[in-house]
Amino acid sequence: VMAGGIVAAFLGPGIATWTWDLFTSAPYAGSYVSLLILYIVSMMLIFFAKIPRPSPEEKSGPARPLSQVASQPEFLVAVVSALVAYGTMNLIMVATPLQMKGCGFDLVSSASVVKWHIVAMFLPSFVTGHLIRSFGVIRIMACGPVLMVFCVLINLNGITIVHFTCALVLLGVGWNFLFVGGTTLLTEAYRPAEKAKAQGLNDFLIFSTAAMTAVSSGFLHDRFGWTAINWAVLPAIGIALCAIVWLGRRRRVMLSSRVA
């Protein structure tokens, strides 16, 4: 799966640049047709996927109500972190090619920036798990919002190809630390029999946010501009960072009380 993200980082932008003018009467129609073909192929491959069956413990083990699971601090911080990770990433990533086009850059330049952004999203996954085991999930998660703040600062201070590339690389790594860390933290909030419900709610919230921010980013860029989008994500990033720091302190206090 992780290697697939790296392949997609090069294949996706490449397809966009190769096919955008496939139909001269409708620019970018070729890219959408190519995307449709890829979706059809993906759907066909899914039919052959072997999904593991739930274990006996997942089927009939002790389970709490979903409301009780979702009210735990670990669950709340994990979900908030993932929502901010996807929401911030989508708003800035989708708006970046639009801003670059407005600054006079061509499609090849925009595709290159998006390519390195996607590489930065998935390449760290090969070491993120090791970093979490070595430094703890809270520390790695806290790095995500910090990197995203640096991404915003770069975006607000220049519109060169270097600015766009560096900002989106930081955004990609920040997304990885925040999302992978949040996913890891989520596993601490549920029992095996609660897994399906807890992850189902988590995924519903995350991908609803991802869909809304992806759809609205273009409109927001057109209506309010590039600078406004970057300023707008800062409060959400701050909320995620505060939530992570709060949970880290809460855990230390609880650990100290147990030792005492």
Enumerate the language-model features and the residues they cover:
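Structural signature of the two symmetry-related core transmembrane helices
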Residues: 139-154, 234
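C-terminal membrane-cytosol helix-exit motif in multi-pass small-molecule transporters
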Residues: 17, 36-56, 243-248
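Juxtamembrane intracellular "pre-TM" segments in multi-pass secondary transporters
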Residues: 51-79
